[in-house]
A protein has these predicted regions:
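N-terminal capping/lid subdomain adjacent to the active-site entrance of alpha/beta enzymes
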Residues: 1-146, 154-161, 165-169, 193-195
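Catalytic alpha/beta core domains of metabolic enzymes, predominantly
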Residues: 182-199
């Protein structure tokens, strides 16, 4: 997302340099290391875990051997008391909303605030709801294939650690973007607190 433009320019420049030198661009990056690479299949968010499990299963049937799904605090909204909001996100604001009146609109507002500063926290009920979602998906897909995860939401480090510890039992491939990349000390804490790789 943030690096896409720069990466596109770099790839174009390497292609131009390769043409100028009469060599493939990969030679400028150190040479050829493999003939093929494994790709994963990302999957759009689904509120229903059975739908998500079936969507992942369909990707397996198409030959993908590595999967990725979005899980996050939007799952916790399905249970009352799943999230703790700051005072300025009272029920009235969530019902009327400064940008449309729903948890989704509040999340849009939160997109402009870095994760550690939103004040949004997962409760035990919220963590259980997300865990149950992943359990249902794993029951459908099985454990024979890696599943990576992304889009956890704008929550702080403590909620990320609590959620990560709960989800470790599902043998997920990795937790992606739980916190912003520039908070390196928090990444270290997260990495040292969970058994699943983080990126």
């Amino acid at each position: 997302r943030l690096g896409g433009g720069g990466c596109g320019v770099e790839m174009a420049l390497m292609d131009l340099a390769g043409k100028a030198y009469g060599v493939p661009a990969y030679m400028l990056a150190g040479g050829k290391y493999r003939d093929q690479i494994r790709v994963y299949s990302d999957t759009p968010s689904k509120k229903d875990p059975v739908e998500m499990g079936n969507a992942l299963k369909e990707r397996m049937e198409r030959g993908f051997t590595y999967l990725k799904m979005d899980i996050g605090i939007w799952i916790s909204e399905q249970v009352e008391g799943g999230l703790v909001f700051p005072n300025d996100y009272s029920d009235d604001k969530l019902n009327e909303g400064s940008t449309g009146g729903s948890l989704k609109s509040m999340m849009v507002e939160a997109q402009n605030v870095m994760h550690p500063f939103t004040g949004i926290q997962l409760t035990d009920k919220g963590i259980s709801e997300i865990s149950e979602y992943v359990k249902i998906v794993r029951d459908i897909v099985g454990y024979e294939i890696p599943i990576a995860t992304d889009h956890f939401g704008h929550i702080g480090l403590e909620s990320c650690i609590r959620l990560g510890k709960e989800l470790d039992k599902y043998s997920l491939a990795w937790y992606e973007d739980m916190i912003p990349w520039q908070y390196t000390n928090q990444w270290k804490q997260l990495k040292n607190s969970v058994d699943t790789p983080v990126c």
